[in-house]
Amino acid sequence: YQGKNEVVLYLSGKLNINGVDIDGLIIKEDAIVLVEFKNYAGEIKAQANGDWFHGSERINGGAKKKDGSTKTVFEQLKINRRALRDGLSRYIKNEDACNNIQALVVFSSISSLKLDEEFKWGANAWVNVSDVEHICEELDTIKARTRSNKSIILTDGDIFDFIRSKGLDERYIITKYSDTNVMPGDLFHEEFAHNGDDFSPNVLL
């Protein structure tokens, strides 16, 4: 994203990981980030125990429970995070990064945010909330750490090896938003077909 020299991989579209659909995945030098988009604007209340709210309206997490009710946003995030961890561990050998995946829930716009204290520190501090306008600023603050407070470090090589192992060739690159100059020669050939300004096709992980 703008002003950053690090390599950042962003996969968009409908991603299916171990049977679970997620909206996006970001891999950067200090975190793997699960991205979920919510089409709500205004006052947002996000909490670890209980429902999330848009004003007085409950925000559904997505999947249904056995009793027919839908999971909370946080419950769904935990499910998706576990699925992502298990799915990525076959391709990314950095165990600390896979075991400490972060989440970023992005709303259309937020006029006020009441964020549970549990999301600010402690075991659930992996949950982050932003809106579309401030997504880059929030992403910059997301830095994964282990339980022993060790920083997560993913090298450019880790990211490029993931691209290779998943076979993400030119067809998947949106060149309008990508700096293809940083890519190794075996991963991008300008003369081959690529997406250009279009959205990339779905990726099955």
Which residues make up each language-model segment?
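Surface-exposed interaction regions that form or flank ligand-binding interfaces
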Residues: 1-21, 26-33, 38-48, 53-205
